[in-house]
Amino acid sequence: MTMTRLPMAIDCRHLTFHYGQFTAVDDLTLEVRPGETMGLLGPNGAGKTTLVRMLTTLTPVQHGELRIFGLDSRRRTVDIRSNIGYVPQQLSIEPALTGRQNVEWFARLYGVPRAERADRVAQALQAMQLLDVADRLAGTYSGGMVRRLEVAQALVNRPSLLVLDEPTVGLDPIARDGVWTQVQSMQAQFGMTVLLTTHYMEEADALCDRVALMHRGVLRAVGTPTELKSKVSPGATLEDVFRHYASSDLRGEEPESPEVSQSEFREIRTSRKVASRAS
């Protein structure tokens, strides 16, 4: 009997992206399996944010091929977006709204049916252990609570792929552990695939099934943390691996696209102003 091969959660083939003369992503090929946690590592300016924006269809693919659960990113953008939860680096909460209202706004954006909306919002808040404070203004939340609220926003449409771009940056170790405890619980419950970018090497080592390390837009290494550490030296840490692949020929912290980041920030703020008026 012939076995049907399930599509990869993420399937990148020769992705290349240019900002003018600057190559942000250079002929990148990568597969992420359904249900795994993949860490995307690299120094500032390595191309991680540009790659994440392509994976979430916020930036169209220029060259190469990208499929998310078998869907072509050029032809099935709407279907892909409905299947992805995304927590960007920039804060995406509206402080003047309650935690519940913030998640409700995302439920509307994702097209969650009105009849299901209240239950789905409550479930997302409960998953991040925020239901007890759901009716407090988000502006009164701690840093860790804000990040958990953003994950709740991303979970309200029950995505198959959760993309977390520096989700615990600036948080203390206890708050970081709190975020990851809840994310891992949801992943175990629903079998989500998780793509994580982080500069915390110990976090990537502990949480990721595999890691992919980028430098100068090029994918330099892919493997389990144990595999990559063993290739560098006996007793190496993941930070040693990072330095091994990324410390030579650094080009400085060149921004991947300041205009794109500012535009995204303006879009987020505009959406939140609309949400505030609507509520």
Task: Annotate each language-model stretch with its function.
Residues 137-141:
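Conserved ABC ATPase signature
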